[in-house]
Regions:
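Conserved C-terminal helix/tail region of periplasmic/extracytoplasmic solute-binding proteins
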Residues: 174, 198, 361, 378-382, ...
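Hinge/lid segment of periplasmic solute-binding proteins
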Residues: 47-53, 117-168, 221, 225, ...
Length: 466
């Protein structure tokens, strides 16, 4: 079965169940990068869909994904060359999107195109979202399940489907005497990782797992993506899709996998506070670690190992039935058009979006340069081999893990969990502190979120607060 279609159906089912959430992040910690395309109009013979050029406005896209910044800059330039419409792409630094968005939206030249990470993010920004009902880009979606709505209004649409798990180096795993078939659950993973760690000098590695960096370029992998697993299993057990009071039923399992990550690692756990996403990439690509938790978006970082040398495992945490678990698949990337922009800029932005998802240039860039699976009718199959691996799990009947982290109450909650994980790893905090940050912090932030929403309903809404 086609990877694009398979993963699209997987995400559609997840969204229909109300369990959709997000991905993100990058190893980049640089300041925001800006590029504006202002070249004169030129004809394009490669486009399968002719771009609309009636709009007199301009486009300003505040991009969430640093790892795709260069590809978006190039695509913006191509669009300007074809249409003459100026397109500016600004990419927020890793972990700074919400803060950057609030700052940019207060400017006279605010973004005409921005994004939210799912229902929680939408709750903050829905008053700024143009109703996309009847727009060309909305009509290009393969399923209505890829849209977020506020009542009947289509406030945002998903533009990429992504998958994450534990990426591994096949060559190194084989050299250690194992294959993917030897790892069917947490106990197997721990046995293999412990053995690799014990034999690291013999195998020529520094550890089984790359460093679990907890600086801002990497901590999202653990305070958000790894934390998704205990949330997913709790929601699944309780038959719910969100909650204002997480119980922490599977936090002992969260501890198991975190302990494994920081013990069978390339570095002392006390050093994790300063370890970065780039450190983990260097360790993995440098063949100093066998396992690396990340997702399909990281392909460009690890492709030098060779497509045939890359594998991906589910993130096992010791939950019952996890032998049938697949990878974590979903989206946290939803386009929103700023309804406070001028009519000309709104039309220019809608035209640009439609061109991105229908033209040969746009769909090729998103599939090949960005490595995306996109939920649009004209989508091209991605050449990203990690996506093919994700498709194999689905074809084998494995159950994909829903992205439940869009239901996390706030960025403040994530930061609290991240700080507690870091202190625990360093030996300056206890696991009870992690549980407190996870459970009590969830309830506290859920109350704050509700109070802010009530304030907005009462007419005191200003710029959203994080």
């Amino acid at each position: 079965m086609n990877a694009k279609k398979t993963l699209s159906m997987t995400l559609a089912a997840a969204m229909a169940a109300g369990l959709l959430a997000g991905c993100g992040g990058s190893s980049s910690t640089a300041a925001s990068s800006t590029s504006t395309s202002t070249e004169s109009k030129a004809e394009s013979t490669a486009a399968s869909t002719e771009a609309t050029t009636d709009a007199a406005g301009k486009v300003y896209y505040l991009n969430f994904k640093p790892e795709q910044d260069e590809a978006w800059q190039n695509l913006a330039k191509k669009y300007t060359e074809e249409t003459g419409v100026p397109v500016t792409v600004v990419t927020a630094a890793s972990g700074q999107y919400e803060t950057t968005l609030m700052s940019e939206m207060e400017k006279s030249e605010a973004p005409t195109l921005f994004q939210v990470n799912g229902p929680v993010g939408l709750a903050n920004w829905k008053d700024y979202c143009l109703d996309l009902s009847g727009s060309d880009v909305y009509g290009q979606l393969t399923s209505d399940s890829f849209a977020l709505k506020d009542g009947d209004a289509v406030t945002s649409i998903a533009y990429v489907i992504e998958t994450y798990g534990i990426i591994y180096n096949k060559e190194l795993l084989t050299a250690a005497g194992y294959t993917q078939d030897d790892i069917k659950g947490f106990d197997d993973l721990k046995k293999v990782a412990d053995d690799i760690q014990a034999r690291k000098a013999e195998l020529g590695v520094d550890g089984a797992f790359t460093s679990a960096g907890m600086d801002g370029s990497s901590d999202w992998r653990f305070k958000t993506h790894l934390a998704n697993l205990p949330i997913y299993y709790e929601y699944k057990a309780d038959g719910i899709g969100s909650t204002d009071a997480i119980k922490g039923t599977y936090l002992d399992n969260y501890k198991k996998i975190w302990d494994l990550y920081i013990t069978d690692s390339t570095c002392d756990p006390k050093l994790l506070a300063s370890k970065t996403g780039n450190d983990a990439v260097a360790e993995f690509v440098g063949k100093k670690a066998v396992f690396y938790q990340n997702g399909t978006w990281a392909y460009s970082d690890v492709k030098d190992l060779g497509d045939d040398n890359l594998g991906m495992l589910p993130i096992y945490i010791g939950a019952e039935g996890e032998e049938n678990q697949g990878l974590c698949t979903g989206s946290e990337n939803f386009w929103c058009v700023n309804n406070t922009s001028s009519d000309e800029d709104i039309q220019a932005t809608l035209d640009f979006l439609n061109w991105c998802v229908t033209s040969d240039e746009g769909t090729s860039a998103m599939a090949d340069d960005m490595g995306f699976v996109i939920p649009f009718k004209a989508a091209k199959d991605s050449t990203n081999p990690l996506i093919a691996i994700a498709n194999d799990y689905v074809a084998e009947g494995k159950t994909s893990v829903d992205w439940c982290f869009s239901t996390m109450p706030s960025e403040e909650w994530k930061n609290g969990v991240g700080s507690a994980l870091t202190a625990y790893a360093a030996g300056t905090g206890s696991w009870d502190d992690v549980v407190t940050a996870f459970v009590d912090g969830w309830a506290r932030n859920a109350r704050l979120k509700q109070a802010r929403q009530e304030d907005r309903k009462g007419g005191s809404a200003g710029m959203p607060r994080p």
